[in-house]
């Protein structure tokens, strides 16, 4: 009788250990980086989906975004804006790796992290590209006077409804119009000065590009140009999604 009990206990422990090892192998740590003017809140649909499949998830606010206490004028340098992600990546133990997911403008912060911490990133996922062109009713601030360059801009409701959220639920658009914050008006020169990428570091990280067919801020020909000139390891196209794919097609993004 005692022998049977010991055998049963041993069998149970063996099954438990095998299950635990398999579960550990299936778990990944996703780090989600939002786009301009947004915050961690824009991932509210994707976070529970990832967690329900056993993954760890960290979604946080870049400087002067979401509920980050910094004011937009407190982050005049690109490195200031990236700092929350930089500090988080620095805190990760060297033996651990994360999956970085950057949406649109957030891909710049992600690229900076890839250059500094390539050994801590298993794969980087770029979700659509950053916007350019007609910003419609986006508000521009000139805190240093009208004769000086602009200091920040805030996405307008018309711009968001027509260019970013045109296929997303109206509730998500409404949420965005209430929560977006100003973004410091960084110039191309600012990024060129502080965002220097190398093949040895940035280029050593596996990259996945996710494109959408209804993205109104970037045309398909530009998306294909990005793919040709950046050499991602994998490209995924999501049909029927606007730029805010985590809002309009969260399940497809998860897949």
What kind of feature is each model-predicted range?
Residues 35-39, 104-105:
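Active-site glycine-rich loops that stabilize anionic/oxyanionic intermediates
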Residues 56, 62-99, 112-119:
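Active-site loop/oxyanion-hole signature of alpha/beta-hydrolase fold enzymes
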């Amino acid at each position: 009788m005692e022998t049977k009990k010991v055998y049963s206990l041993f069998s149970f422990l063996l099954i438990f250990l095998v299950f635990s090892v398999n579960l550990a192998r299936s778990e990944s740590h996703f780090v989600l980086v939002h786009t301009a003017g947004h915050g961690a809140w824009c991932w509210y649909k994707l976070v529970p989906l990832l967690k329900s499949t056993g993954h760890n998830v960290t979604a946080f606010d870049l400087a002067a975004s979401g509920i980050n206490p910094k004011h937009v004028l407190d982050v005049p340098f690109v490195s200031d804006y990236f700092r929350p992600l930089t500090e988080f990546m620095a805190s990760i133990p060297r033996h651990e790796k994360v999956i970085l997911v950057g949406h649109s403008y957030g891909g710049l912060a992600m690229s900076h992290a890839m250059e500094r911490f390539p050994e801590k990133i298993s794969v980087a996922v770029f979700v659509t590209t950053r916007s350019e062109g007609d910003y419609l009713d986006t508000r521009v601030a000139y805190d240093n006077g009208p004769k000086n360059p602009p200091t920040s801009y805030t996405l307008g409701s018309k711009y968001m409804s027509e260019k970013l959220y045109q296929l997303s639920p109206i509730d998500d658009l409404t949420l965005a119009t209430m929560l977006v914050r100003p973004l410091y008006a960084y110039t191309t020169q600012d990024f060129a000065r502080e965002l220097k990428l190398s093949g040895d570091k940035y280029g050593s990280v596996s990259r996945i590009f996710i494109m959408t067919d209804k993205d109104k801020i970037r045309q398909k020909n530009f998306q294909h140009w990005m793919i040709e000139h950046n050499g991602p390891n994998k490209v995924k196209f999501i049909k029927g999604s606007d730029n805010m794919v985590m809002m309009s097609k969260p399940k497809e993004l998860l897949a």
